[in-house]
């Protein structure tokens, strides 16, 4: 505790650079800024941004209000860390939750729900169903769980997707969203990222997956890295 989001982002950047990240992330949508390390502690997680995502972060200044900011991590609040890495040209995207001290059971339950929604989306894609069907299934599950007004943002500032294809670029298609009436092709890679946002913060999970003949194969940490980690 006591460290700023930006200080923590610096540590994450060191690890990523040492693992081969070259410094740039390609985007298909132009012009679009992208902060590859989003760290949102507590109420920073509720701040919407110009970036089409559930959690944008406050950023270091008003000229670039995206990513980690000067908020300090406090005990008892969720800390969302979303990192984009590029390995030999190929993009991966991963989110995990952290906390210091006691984290309320309400937050833990919300994370469990997001994990379940991620499984629903993944299973739908793995069967070869359309990405729009995966979106609808995930969205309906969220509404049944009581997260309809907070899924991927606080209404009306909600991102309308639950996953995005990645490859040589961060924002490839298809997307798990309405209107993408086609499946993720065999060999296609998708970052699946259900998140729920409240005034006190954000919580969720993200991994990058590839569709195989047997279903969806995880390309990032998956079950090897816990969804919630206590410092």
Describe each model-derived feature in a short phrase.
Residues 1-231:
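Active-site neighborhoods and metal-handling regions in enzymes and metal-associated proteins
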């Amino acid at each position: 505790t006591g460290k700023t989001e930006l200080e923590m982002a610096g540590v994450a950047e060191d690890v990523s650079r040492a693992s081969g990240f070259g410094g740039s992330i390609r985007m298909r949508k132009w012009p679009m800024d992208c902060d590859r390390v989003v760290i949102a502690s507590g109420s920073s997680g509720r701040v919407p941004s110009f970036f089409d995502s559930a959690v944008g972060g406050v950023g270091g200044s008003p000229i670039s209000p995206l990513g980690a900011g000067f908020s300090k991590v406090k005990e008892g609040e969720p800390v969302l860390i979303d990192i984009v890495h590029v390995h030999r040209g190929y993009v991966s995207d991963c989110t995990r939750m952290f906390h210091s001290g006691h984290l309320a059971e309400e937050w833990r339950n919300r994370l469990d729900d997001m994990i379940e929604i991620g499984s629903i989306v993944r299973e739908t894609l793995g069967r070869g169903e359309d990405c729009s069907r995966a979106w609808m299934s995930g969205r309906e599950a969220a509404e049944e769980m009581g997260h309809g007004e907070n899924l991927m943002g606080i209404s009306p500032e909600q991102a309308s997707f639950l996953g995005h294809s990645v490859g040589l670029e961060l924002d490839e298609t298809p997307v798990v969203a309405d209107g993408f009436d086609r499946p993720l092709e065999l060999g296609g890679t998708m970052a699946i990222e259900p998140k729920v946002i409240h005034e006190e913060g954000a919580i969720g999970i993200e991994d990058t997956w590839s569709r195989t003949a047997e279903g969806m194969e995880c390309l990032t940490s998956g079950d090897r890295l816990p969804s919630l980690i206590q410092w």
